[in-house]
Amino acid sequence: MAEGETMSKTTGMPQPVMLTGEKPRAMATVITRVVEALTGEKSGIINFASGAVSVNYSDVSPSPVQAGALAANYSAEFLNRINVLPVKAIEGESVMVGSGGPLAYVNNRGERRNPQAGATMTPHRYQCRKVNFDTFISHDDLDAWTHLENYPELAKAAVDQRRNLDRLLIGFNGTHYSSPSDPETYPERQDCGVGWLEKYRQEARKKVISGLSVAGRDEGGKIVSYGDYGTIDALVLDGWQSAIAPQYRMDLVAVCSLNTLYRKEYPYVNAVVPNQPNMELLVNQIMLNNPTLGNLPAMPVPFFPDNAVLVTSLRNLSLYWLEGSTRTLAKDEPEYNRLSVYESWNEAYMVERYEAGCLIDAIFWR
């Protein structure tokens, strides 16, 4: 960490450090530092736009006191909980080796012993596809924030966070890969790759439970419209109990959206009355601080569909990236009044063992 730089206790991200006793940095210096922060390369080996090797910008006049911090956004912490693995081939097979059935048996009669298969191999094909994560910073923004010593670190943290959030967006909503992609038609980046949920739909239909309904309730919790299940808990519990074999049930979680948890929890929270403080405390501690879904720990994540729940262990989900495929080009583009960073990765979303999870899909809330 640079001298004088501080870290936020809540976000762990770099916090702004004001320059003191010196004139704000020249634009060219800021561009150099931003490029180095975003690309990890010294600006001397970056290919800038033609004629922009030495850009003469006047120093920015002193501005009113400003402070910068990383804007509030969704968390991409989910990526730290799953496998993010480098691979050497752009496509191939991922093989999971597991144990077969029981091996123990008794044969004391001198008959031929018949060994059982002690290991099973489950291959799944993967293909890493290129996805672009291009971004730019306008010259106006660079002008406005040259007086912040750690503006490059803040910019890098924001870009890194957005890139990881886009990976979640594709992982939970991606249905196909199309070049070029169409952000207007597919705002949730459905055409930027096949995500984890779609992998279940395409490759493990027997592990997809689809089209079931949950009863509708009024604010008092009374059923006003009957469904296949009285609660979302009952649907999820019955789903994973029937679809996932016992040997895969040890560390399951229910991945869902925040709206799904809200639908479950609101009737209980709404029923709490002021003259029942113990009940209010119980609801807060058990339900809100330690949410569950279908008797499993609930893991709400950004961009997850409101009509689905993925039950799996987190180590069953992977994001593969192709070694040596990351390409980054930083260009100062004065003709567009911006500093652009062009970046691409080759990635693939993988479910290691379909039998170790299930997708409850197309849930209908009555």
Residue ranges and their predicted role:
Residues L237-Y248:
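Short, basic/hydrophobic alpha-helical segments
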Residues N132, H139-L235:
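Alpha-helical scaffold segments that mediate packing/assembly in large oligomeric complexes
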Residues G92-E93, G98, S179-P187, W365:
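Short amphipathic alpha-helical patches
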Residues A52-F136, K156-A157, R189, G193:
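Assembly/oligomerization interface modules of large self-assembling protein complexes
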Residues A2-F48, S54-A67, D191-R217, I223-Y226, ...:
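Sequence/fold signature of self-assembling virion shell proteins
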Residues Y248-A254:
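Oxyanion-binding "anion nests"
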Residues I170, A254, E265-P267:
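Transmembrane alpha-helix/helix-exit interface in multi-pass inner-membrane proteins
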